Amino acid sequence: MATGASSPNFDDRHIRWQTLGDFKHLSVMVLDIDVSNNIVDFLVKFEPNEQIFVHRHLAPTNILVIDGEHVVYETSGAAVKNVRQTGKAWITPKGDAHTEGGGRAGAIVHTV
């Protein structure tokens, strides 16, 4: 399960984080699944200074950084594409291959 210091501004101790299979460096909390529209609404908690697996989004994805620093990397993992701070929102296009993770204190993001 992802660990890291909680922000004094956002207390996630009461969130029931779950692992996602054998994937390392992240935990999730599923908020809603809309099967008929293929939409999953969830929170992701990224461990500090770690990257997750390379992946592509199957649809445009709305993302909001709730806490911490969310770092997006090129698929090689060597180069940083973007660093997004608390409060930053954006849309990831369909098919965009990347890896991502938390900054110094990790990150919590809302993804739809």
Regions found by a protein language model. Name each.
Residues 47-48, 57-76:
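Glycine- and acidic-residue-biased ligand/ion/polar-headgroup-sensing regions
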Residues 52:
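A short mixed-secondary-structure module that forms the rim of ligand-binding clefts
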